[in-house]
Amino acid sequence: MLRKLILITVATVFFACQLLVNPVSALELDEESRTVQYNEQGDEVVISIKEAERGKRLFNDTCAQCHLGGVTKTNPNVGLSLEALERAEPPRDNIAGLIDYMKNPTTYDGEIDIKEIHPNTVRSDILPERRNLTDDDLEAIAAHILSQPKSPRKQWGDGKVYN
């Protein structure tokens, strides 16, 4: 009887773990989902599956502490949804805009420099993980952020964005 109980418990745990483990979401993105705006002029790029996976890994390592799921923990009013990024000043709904923001962060309205309090590549003492990020790394992170709202599996950045 005890042996049956142990076997059932092990089987239950095994199958429960299978349900909890998600497949790699970058692989689920089709070409349309991987097409993101590159600059304010509207040029677009299609990121490869490999770039999408790299961007996801870098985002999880350096940004997800505060932006898990595209929500901003320190200010839930402003997330990383395309709508919120588009309304920022200057707009951050493109790769070039996000790279500029990651290097030189400003408030949502673009009025105040927040390098002293927001992680960036200039002041890596705030978040040491950003110390060695290259422009290619920042581009991969930006592409990941911009492709996530197009993912059919999950919501991204659905914080409180006021009209």
From Swiss-Prot:
Record PROSITE patterns: CYTC (PS51007)
Signal sequence coordinates: 1-26
One GO CC term, this protein: plasma membrane-derived thylakoid membrane
Predominant place of localization: membrane
GO molecular function: electron transfer activity; heme binding; iron ion binding
Compartments where located: Cellular thylakoid membrane
UniProt-listed GO biological process terms: photosynthesis, light reaction; respiratory electron transport chain
Cofactors (names): heme c
Domain of life: Bacteria
Binding note for cofactor: Binds 1 heme c group covalently per subunit.
Topology of the protein relative to the lipid bilayer: Peripheral membrane protein
Keywords: Electron transport, Heme, Iron, Membrane, Metal-binding, Photosynthesis, Photosystem II, Signal, Thylakoid, Transport
Subunit structure: PSII is composed of 1 copy each of membrane proteins PsbA, PsbB, PsbC, PsbD, PsbE, PsbF, PsbH, PsbI, PsbJ, PsbK, PsbL, PsbM, PsbT, PsbX, PsbY, PsbZ, Psb30/Ycf12, peripheral proteins PsbO, CyanoQ (PsbQ), PsbU, PsbV and a large number of cofactors. It forms dimeric complexes.
Function in brief: One of the extrinsic, lumenal subunits of photosystem II (PSII). PSII is a light-driven water plastoquinone oxidoreductase, using light energy to abstract electrons from H(2)O, generating a proton gradient subsequently used for ATP formation. The extrinsic proteins stabilize the structure of photosystem II oxygen-evolving complex (OEC), the ion environment of oxygen evolution and protect the OEC against heat-induced inactivation. Low-potential cytochrome c that plays a role in the OEC of PSII.
HAMAP family tied to this protein: PSII_Cyt550 (MF_01378)
NCBIfam families (alphabetical): PS_II_C550
Family: Belongs to the cytochrome c family. PsbV subfamily.
The name this protein goes by in its record: Photosystem II extrinsic protein V
Source species of the chain: Aphanothece halophytica
Source organism phylogeny: Bacteria, Bacillati, Cyanobacteriota, Cyanophyceae, Oscillatoriophycideae
